[in-house]
Amino acid sequence: MSAIQNLHSFDPFADASKGDDLLPAGTEDYIHIRIQQRNGRKTLTTVQGIADDYDKKKLVKAFKKKFACNGTVIEHPEYGEVIQLQGDQRKNICQFLVEIGLAKDDQLKVHGF
């Protein structure tokens, strides 16, 4: 008869947690860009998921200057600090974040109509 060599239990997810430290910081986190309807034709664009390493107030200042819109940083109970901009700035924000190297194109998730 053949002897069974491997009698140890196997955890299929054990190796998945070992490789996490090899990834650069922020590669698995997504930046969510959403649009919300206000009254009439007015809209708000929200940006959520930017790492805490970056100063969000300075980012808002750059967004406001580049896109000629108003914006602020709000504290959301579920998502933490969220950037809020007036108008539909989804494409502009995507281009800007990739341009300055803050995020890669596959890290950006754009939501909305």
Swiss-Prot record:
Q: Which Pfam families match?
A: SUI1 (PF01253)
CDD domains, alphabetized:
eIF1_SUI1
Q: Using the record's annotations, give every residue carrying the modification N-acetylserine.
A: S2
Q: Which PROSITE patterns match?
A: SUI1
Compartments in which it is found: Cytoplasm
Superkingdom as given in the UniProt entry: Eukaryota
**Modification Phosphoserine, positions:** S2, S9
Q: A GO term (biological process) for this protein?
A: translational initiation
Point out the annotated site residues (description: Binds 40S ribosomal subunit): R41, K65
InterPro entries from the UniProt entry? SUI1, SUI1_dom_sf, SUI1_euk
Which molecular function terms from Gene Ontology are attached? ribosomal small subunit binding; RNA binding; translation factor activity, RNA binding; translation initiation factor activity
Give any Gene Ontology cellular component.
Answer: eukaryotic 43S preinitiation complex
UniProt keyword list? Acetylation, Cytoplasm, Initiation factor, Phosphoprotein, Protein biosynthesis
Assembly information from the UniProt record: Component of the 43S pre-initiation complex (43S PIC), which is composed of the 40S ribosomal subunit, EIF1, eIF1A (EIF1AX), eIF3 complex, EIF5 and eIF2-GTP-initiator tRNA complex (eIF2 ternary complex). Interacts with EIF4G1; in specific 5'-UTR length and AUG context. Interacts with EIF5; which in a mutual exclusive interaction associates either with EIF1 or with EIF2S2 on a common binding site. Interacts with RENT2.
* Protein family membership: Belongs to the SUI1 family.
The record's PANTHER family line, in alphabetical order, gives: EUKARYOTIC TRANSLATION INITIATION FACTOR SUI1
Q: What does this protein do?
A: Component of the 43S pre-initiation complex (43S PIC), which binds to the mRNA cap-proximal region, scans mRNA 5'-untranslated region, and locates the initiation codon. Together with eIF1A (EIF1AX), EIF1 facilitates scanning and is essential for start codon recognition on the basis of AUG nucleotide context and location relative to the 5'-cap.
**How is this protein named in the record?**
Eukaryotic translation initiation factor 1
